[in-house]
């Protein structure tokens, strides 16, 4: 049996999760997801970018999107040279809790300048990454930092994984030019 002190702690943690799942049931959230899907269906390849915890989620997102038939890859090194030429058929999904990570902003801006559409998934809508994006999906969960040290960000990525899987499922079965690769 769980003690009342332990139960209270669990309930506090679940409040943020519950709030997030209530927000995803809104019409505005559904429209935001559809806007992202519309941008992605115009692309022949999808690039995920992020640093730190977001880079690992980007790798997961790329794998998930490949599983549903969309050619995707993750750039986990922010100093990777950006392709030369035009990127009209490329979509970028930039992941960042703060939306202010310098390396992610730099890479997203380079890709956008090359013609890539830019979808960002951030914790808040009023951040630099969201403002430069063609579409921003924000999730508003409580940020959790170990001892308030920026190097130990323990903010839950559950919302980001849910959003990526939701978009991936929407893309499943939608025809794109990479269908012959799979």
Task: Annotate each predicted stretch with a short phrase.
Residues 7-9, 32-35, 79-80, 137-139:
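Short hydrophobic/aromatic-rich motifs at helix boundaries and adjacent loops
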Residues 7, 25-27, 34, 103, ...:
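Residue-identity detector for glutamine
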Residues 20-24, 39, 170:
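Residues that form generic nucleotide/phosphate-binding pockets
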Residues 1-32:
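HTH-adjacent hinge/linker in prokaryotic transcriptional regulators
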Residues 32, 47, 178-179:
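Secondary-structure transition/capping residues
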Residues 174-182:
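A short, charged, Gly/Pro-tolerant segment at domain boundaries
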Residues 41-175:
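Glycine-rich phosphate-binding loops that contact phosphosugars or nucleotide phosphates
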Residues 31-43:
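Glycine-rich phosphate/diphosphate-binding loops that line cofactor/substrate pockets in enzymes
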